[in-house]
Amino acid sequence: MKRTYQPSKLVRKRRHGFRARTQTVGGRKVLAARRSKGRKRLSA
């Protein structure tokens, strides 16, 4: 059986990266929440 996690840096950046987050309203909310919480890393 194929495992669910097949690492790829490109896909990781495209799906969960900073620029991907800023492009949608929900993503911007995620960034805002992580900023207010004081997260060291905002996105992948």
From Swiss-Prot:
Origin: domain of life: Bacteria
GO molecular function, a single term: structural constituent of ribosome
GO cellular component: ribonucleoprotein complex; ribosome
Entry keyword set: Ribonucleoprotein, Ribosomal protein
Keyword Disulfide bond set for record: no
Region (Disordered): 1-44
Positions with biased composition (Basic residues): 10-19, 31-44
Any GO BP annotation: translation
Family: Belongs to the bacterial ribosomal protein bL34 family.
HAMAP family: Ribosomal_bL34
Protein's UniProt name: Large ribosomal subunit protein bL34
